């Protein structure tokens, strides 16, 4: 009886945690490569390497350089937003997610991004 009750309690907690997003804590949304022909390509490539290693502050510098080089790059703004989120600047991250969303209408990775939708309070 105690074993069944214990299993039931664990199962309920797993469902609760999954529903609140806590089950995904610690996961990092992937940074995006530049669109073909983008002037930001070299900066984003370097930034992605640092981002994947958890060097979010260094990645941010590269992503910002990419966004400056190609202000119309949705991927650059998206990556800036990811790095800003990781470094704790959520207000600025939200601004860059909005820009990425507006510029990236044809990019399903951006349009369907969970973290972007959370920042923009979308469903």
Where are these predicted regions, by residue range?
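Conserved structural position within tetratricopeptide repeats
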Residues: 64-68, 102
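Register position in tetratricopeptide repeats
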Residues: 52-53, 86-87, 119-123
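Canonical tetratricopeptide repeat
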Residues: 45, 79, 113-114
